[in-house]
Amino acid sequence: VKTLVSDSYLKKRMSDYDPSKAGNSKDVKEGYIQEGEETTHFDVLDKDGNAVSVTTTLNGAFGCGIVVAGAGFLLNNEMDDFSVKPGVPNMFGAVGQEANAIAPGKRMLSSMTPAIVLNNNKPWIVVGTPGGTTIPTSVYTTIVDIIDFKLTPEQAVNYPKFHQQWLPDVIYVEENFNPTVITQLEAMDYKIEKRSSIGRTEVIMDNGNMITAVADKRGDDGASGY
């Protein structure tokens, strides 16, 4: 609803309107609103050090399209995360093999990567993100940026992201990714594709003296404390 009533969306909808002449009603099409990738993530850390990192998903748009009677929630279509046939990609372009084939009593491969990093056996970094197959990359790079490159949680979350998943043979980068790095990669014959955003990473970090919670600026995410 927020998008539907926003000035930017309304201006886009009116961009082909000409008040000087009659239009053809058949030319009026539905608007396009960028939907999320159907995955949600949240982190919790309390004063006693109890930590929770939860990623939950419908997988595709509206999951399998079935609503649980009397409960009002949709069932997912995580079956797509199985390999229907070796070498055939799923809806996220991930190519599966025989090891991930559909079989009774088997759990499908999933990209969901809710993570809790311990320091001296105590929760230190609580992190996760939605984003389909890009999830492991975003979680990994965020952790590495904090631990190895000494970035603050906010810097690590909002730093331009990239992703590569073996197949398709492409490196996805956000539009604000370092152009020098892109040029260097292209010079080595890597194929680069730009995306408006990759993931929406959430982080809570407890350094012993202070707890920091960071919500990704890429979406309408939020962080709060008590």
Each language-model region and where it sits:
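Alpha-helical support elements that line or immediately flank enzyme active sites
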Residues: 129-151
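Internal maturation/activation junctions in enzymes
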Residues: 1-58, 70-71, 78, 86-89, ...
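Short glycine-rich loop/turn motifs
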Residues: 37-42, 51, 110-115, 200-201
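Extended C-terminal subregions enriched in glycine
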Residues: 85, 106, 139, 148-196
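Extended hydrophobic
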Residues: 46, 117-118, 124
